[in-house]
């Protein structure tokens, strides 16, 4: 059987990717890789250095020289050049900037390199927007999560409220709609389901229901020999 089993979870902002991916990784004893945090770290650094978001070449050069470390402990800390940016990268300003930076090919090239290195460490659950289509095209299970735009905005708004960020639900909805547009229309690795991905609409579902469904799908593949036959 393939040693480094891979589960790819893609979907738009607010679909529940990170929460669900972390729960699955915990239950399976796999590594969890939040690729969105990597892009956020680059966006945060660009903002901190006052690099205009339109300066693609300068941002790409900066990304090539940036070290991003994801802590695989329960705390899930994110480090950018040794600095703990776990909370800082979740700001509304970073959220509004990240899709612009993520569309730059050389930035994606650098971060995909780091993401594939992470996947080589062992069994992994990785979430993002192009995991099943580009980062891990041979993943053993590919899931594409979605939910209604209103549901996703509400979830993100509640998340920001818990973090002490005072934004209205309408502002969060506008930011999310703009990000959806950027992600779906970008020329490099647009947000689309992989041809062999399983689509799950999480609207109105509890986290436990979604996690159980994905674990069942994964276990079915393992038990029926799918993983073994596809990855010898």
From Swiss-Prot:
InterPro entries: Cytidylate_kin, Cytidylate_kinase_dom, P-loop_NTPase. This is Cytidylate kinase. One of its GO terms (molecular function) is CMP kinase activity. Its main location: cytoplasm. GO terms for biological process: nucleobase-containing small molecule interconversion; pyrimidine nucleotide metabolic process. Its EC number is 2.7.4.25. One of its GO terms (cellular component) is cytosol. The keyword Transcription regulation does not apply. Pfam families: Cytidylate_kin. It comes from Desulfitobacterium hafniense (strain Y51). Keywords: ATP-binding, Cytoplasm, Kinase, Nucleotide-binding, Transferase. It is found in: Cytoplasm. Belongs to the cytidylate kinase family. Type 1 subfamily. It catalyses: CMP + ATP = CDP + ADP; dCMP + ATP = dCDP + ADP. It comes from the Bacteria.
């Amino acid at each position: 059987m393939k040693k480094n089993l891979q589960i790819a979870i893609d979907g738009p902002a607010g679909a529940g990717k990170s929460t669900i991916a972390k729960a699955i990784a915990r239950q399976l004893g796999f590594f969890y890789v939040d690729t969105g945090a990597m892009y956020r770290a680059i966006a945060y650094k660009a903002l901190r250095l006052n690099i205009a978001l339109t300066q693609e070449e300068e941002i790409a050069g900066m990304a090539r020289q940036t070290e991003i470390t994801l802590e695989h402990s329960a705390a899930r800390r994110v480090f950018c050049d040794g600095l703990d940016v776990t909370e800082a990268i979740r700001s509304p300003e970073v959220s509004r900037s990240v899709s612009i930076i993520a569309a730059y090919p050389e930035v994606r090239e650098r971060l995909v390199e780091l993401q594939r290195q992470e996947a080589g460490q062992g069994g992994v659950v990785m979430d993002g927007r192009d995991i099943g289509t580009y980062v891990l095209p041979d993943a053993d299970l590919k899931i594409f999560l979605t939910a209604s735009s209103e549901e996703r905005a509400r979830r993100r708004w509640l998340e920001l409220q818990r973090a002490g960020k005072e934004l209205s639900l309408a502002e969060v909805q506008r930011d999310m709609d703009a990000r959806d547009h950027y992600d779906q229309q970008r020329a490099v690795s647009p947000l689309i389901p992989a041809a062999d991905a399983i689509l799950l609409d999480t609207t109105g579902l509890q986290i436990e229901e979604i996690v159980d469904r994905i674990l069942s799908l994964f276990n079915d593949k393992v038990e029926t020999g799918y993983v073994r036959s596809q990855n010898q």
